[in-house]
Every structure is written in C-alpha cells, then in structure tokens.
Amino acid sequence: MQTRITRLLGLDHPLLQAGMSWASSSAALPAAVSAAGALGVIAAGPMYPEALRAAIRELRQLTAAAGCPSAPFAVNVPLYNKRAAELLDVVEAEQVPILIASQGGTRGHLARFQSQGVKWLHVVASALHARKAEDAGVDGVIAIGGEAGGHPAPDEVSAMVVVRAVLRAVRLPVIAGGGVADGAGIAAMLAL
C-alpha cells in the first residue's frame, strides 16, 4: 500500500513503530520492524551517545543480515533531553536517514539535518503545534493523542480527534500515533 508516508520515507508499509523508551532503545525491535518494511525507531531518550551509536550500528547489521541492508529506520530524540545536542551529533555522524524529534522545537537543528537529506518528523499533540512544525519546515508530523505512551497531550484528547484536527491544519504528511495497536486501529487511521 502506497501513501504519502511510504513515498516520503521509502517504506513498504505505512506503519511506524513508536520510540518506546527502554523497549526500543536497543536495536532488536527497530531492526525487525524495518526489515519487515515498516519504520523501526530507536528511542534515544534513555541513552548516552555511545550507546546510541552502538544501537544504530547493530540495527544496520541486523537489517543487513535479514537481507535488507538499506531498510529505512529512524532515531527519536526528545529535544528537552539534557543530552539532546550530543545525541543529535551521533544521529548526524551515523547518517541516520530519518529523525523523529519530540518535546521541543527544532531549535536551529532542522536545516543542519535537511541539508544532508535527513527526513525530519516532528511529534505534535495539537493542530497549533503541527502548524508551528510546518512553518519551521519539517518533512512530516506524528500527531499523537492521549493514548500515546511517553508524554502525550496533557488534556488526553483521543488520537482520532487530534489527527483529524492536524490533517485539517497542515498540508504535511501526517502519521497517527497513540492507541493504534491492531488492524482495526490501522484501518481507522488510514480512513482519516
């Protein structure tokens, strides 16, 4: 199935594995997701730069061993993190193809990554934040609702509501996040 997201990110399937702190701060889960044709995501939040570098390299080894040496993958960096600048340096040095930024503005980093061909997706919890991300020049947004793990919107509005509002507010490709855990949820989000 081809969508704006599959075309933008070079995926076979319009599915993205969330950056789930400790659950995806190692390479195994994101590598399996990427090898299956969706977007695997390494969660950099709980990591130190050296561990992130090792996870990126291991993911590449695992996807190559699975016969998918050029499988797209992403790293999620929470921009509020006190190590965010160091983590972004690792993402740049390791030539990660897709960066997912969350919990903060682009802070002057966006141009640096886009000039190298990196796709920048920004996690948003409202139409207002989506418009700000679009105005900053990001490549796409991940609209999350109250069902999302990590740091969802404080008002806990459903992803179905947030995603619809974001789709009306921006022209960017939009990925739905939060509470999408089975085929019915995927079908519902694709119908928006």
What do these predicted ranges mean?
Residues 21, 172-186:
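Glycine-rich adenosine-cofactor-binding loop
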Residues 187-192:
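A compact, surface-exposed functional segment
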